[in-house]
A protein has these predicted regions:
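Short beta-strand-to-coil "C-cap" segments at the C-terminal boundary of structured domains/repeats
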Residues: 167-170, 365-369
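Acyltransferase donor/substrate-recognition loop-hinge adjacent to the catalytic core
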Residues: 2-4, 141-222
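A conserved beta-strand-loop-helix scaffold within acyl/acetyltransferase catalytic domains
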Residues: 22-55, 63-73, 200-303
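Generic start-of-chain signal for non-secretory N-termini
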Residues: 1-32
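Acyl-donor binding region in acyl/amide transferases
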Residues: 74-155, 160, 274-352
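An acidic- and aromatic-residue-enriched active-site/binding cleft used to recognize and process polar
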Residues: 55, 66-70, 85-87, 118-120, ...
Length: 369
């Protein structure tokens, strides 16, 4: 395939093609989980999106490009980021898409490309390079195995890798967690607190949780602090939907939040059934999975410990609280979100659960010439 036309996404047809393309590519793939259409539409207002067509007018590729100015200032770089990249198994299509990103980035004064990355660290990041036979989730990117091969053929190299682990939920809390949790409770005066929706949305706990996340994640690769308006949106759209039994915070004696663990029952099969559409009936699948008949896996969405308290049993306190709840609700497996491969301190917290690395994803980079 040679005659590839890349357009900036502007018309209603182009928007719809951008949304529907991955569903067509992965129509017969049982591991792919779609994004919600409404989330994609909203995101298109914040990025420069491109759609690729073949010589008969069929959509064959897509990508979004954007510049995170705060990240560039923080990390001392001039990078254009890309995300939401999908394409058929054709080198010319991949090249046309990335040429468009590189050209647009150059026009904006950037000197390198990085991605797939989100606008914030809580967005989906990293191209899958291992684990193509594992079910995806609401918090991660899925792509076919030919993606990294074609991207690397274009001269892109590894900037960072994230790994994801899966653990079988034990019937009883591991002794290591119990022992360390006891120390945190009795010596440091730390305590578990469960929240109501009102406390999260109206009582300020939502903002306090994201303040902790911003503080704990600040040193991590590519991270930029989430602004207040985005915190408000995430709190209202997502955190309020979480079963509050699956959300734990740890407070010190001054009632300051020093740790948080936001988890949620997997929505993967519900999203597959809905095909990413809330209407007319897609919302029934999602609400049903959240409220009534959940899947057997719990997603560990966001885990953070205040830097001053890291290594003092905060994580153990959270798991001591959550493991019995997971068992009570019938969950069998826990799957962590992407974690940087060199973040050994964070990865070591799973050791008592005999973790298995099941996925690896990569951020690529390339200089713009």
């Amino acid at each position: 395939m040679r005659n590839i036309r890349v357009e900036k996404v502007q018309s209603r047809t182009e928007v719809n093609d951008f949304i529907e393309l991955p569903k067509r590519i992965y129509a017969d793939n049982k591991y792919y989980v779609p994004d919600l259409d409404l989330d994609i539409r909203e995101n298109l207002t914040k990025v420069q999106a491109f759609i690729a067509y073949n010589d008969v007018g069929d959509a064959v590729g897509r990508v979004a490009a954007f510049i995170n100015q705060k990240a560039n200032v923080k990390w001392g770089q001039k990078a254009v980021r890309f995300s939401q990249i999908d394409f058929i198994n054709d080198f010319d299509v991949a090249k046309a898409l990335m040429d468009a990103v590189e050209e647009w980035g150059h026009e904006q004064g950037m000197d390198k490309v990085m991605g797939p990355m989100g606008q914030y660290d809580f967005d989906k990041e990293g191209m899958l390079v291992e684990g193509f036979d594992q079910l995806s989730s609401i918090i991660e990117i899925y792509n076919a195995s030919y993606y990294p091969a074609l991207i690397e053929k274009l001269g892109y190299t590894k900037a960072a890798d994230w790994v994801q682990t899966r653990m079988e939920i034990p019937k009883v809390v591991p002794k290591m967690y119990s022992r360390v949790a006891k120390y945190a409770r009795e010596t440091l005066g730390l305590k578990v607190k469960k929240l109501t929706t009102r406390e999260i949305t109206k009582g300020g706990y939502g903002k306090r949780i994201f303040h902790l996340l911003n503080e704990a994640y600040s040193p991590l690769f590519g991270f930029t602090e989430m602004p207040p308006q985005q915190v408000e949106q995430y709190t209202n759209q997502y955190v309020r939907l979480v079963d509050k039994r699956l959300l734990t915070i740890i407070e010190n004696e001054k009632e300051e939040i020093v740790g948080t663990c936001v988890t949620m029952g997997s929505l993967s099969q519900a999203l597959r059934k809905s095909r990413g559409r809330l209407f007319p009936f897609g919302w029934l699948h999602l609400i049903g999975s959240l409220k009534w008949k959940h899947e057997d896996t719990v997603q560990l969405l966001l885990i953070a410990v205040k830097p001053d308290y890291q290594g003092y049993g905060v994580s153990a306190l959270m798991f001591e609280d959550l493991i019995p709840i997971y068992n009570e609700l019938g969950f069998k497996w826990a799957e962590a979100g992407p974690q940087l491969e060199y973040n050994h301190k964070e990865l070591s917290q799973w050791r008592p659960l005999n973790p298995e690395i099941i996925k690896r994803r990569r951020c690529y980079t390339k200089a713009i010439k």
